[in-house]
Amino acid sequence: MNTIILAIDTATPAVTAGIVKLDGIEVLAERVSIDARAHAEQLTPNVLAALADAGLTVGDLGAVVVGCGPGPFTGLRVGMATAAAYGHALGIPVHGVCSLDAIGIESAGTVSEVLVVTDARRREVYWARYRDGVRIDGPSVNSPVDVPGAAEALARPAVYPTASGLVRAVADFSAEPAPLIPLYLRRPDAKPQQPAVTR
């Protein structure tokens, strides 16, 4: 298997694209833009810039890893559709991972237990709890007061999924990837309009 991986995440305000060499999880290049409203506009330029920074082209890629949330509808669709398009066009596998896992797995070996919390908007948070980098609870969406330790976690500086975390979150690159399924964890903000009642 070609060991050059494109890692993408658009589940948070960060628009992440990175090129990772699977051997040793070596990040060759990574581009991150923080803009919750510009995932579609920034993802492809970030991917192309990361490839250029690494001195590679899309033809050098052996697989794609994409964060599947939890996150907002539009943000997730941008990342997942882009990952699927690269996979289809290049004939390479696309592995979906929980975006919170990409953050939690980076804590392995540094702290025994960590709570990963991201903004779910509408005064709610997405969260999952990890022990030694392995998810032990979640992912879920709740009000911060309903998540033990969330207030403390929210007081810390923001951390977003990284290219290395996304790649580390894939359990087995030799296995057939599961279908990409977004982790919305709640109903969309937009609702179908009810027909007008006439009398």
Residue ranges and their predicted role:
Residues 63-94:
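DPxDG-like acidic metal-binding loop motif
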Residues 29-35, 68-72:
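A short glycine/serine-rich beta->alpha loop
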Residues 49, 84, 88, 109, ...:
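Short, well-ordered alpha-helices that flank and scaffold nucleotide-derived cofactor binding pockets
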Residues 1-26, 34-42, 95-199:
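Oxyanion-binding and handling regions
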Residues 47, 83, 104:
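Generic structural marker for isolated residues within well-ordered, non-membrane alpha-helices
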Residues 31, 61-64, 183:
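Generic beta-strand hydrophobic packing signal
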Residues 47-63, 149:
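Phosphate/pyrophosphate-binding loops at sites that engage ATP/ADP/AMP, CoA/4′-phosphopantetheine
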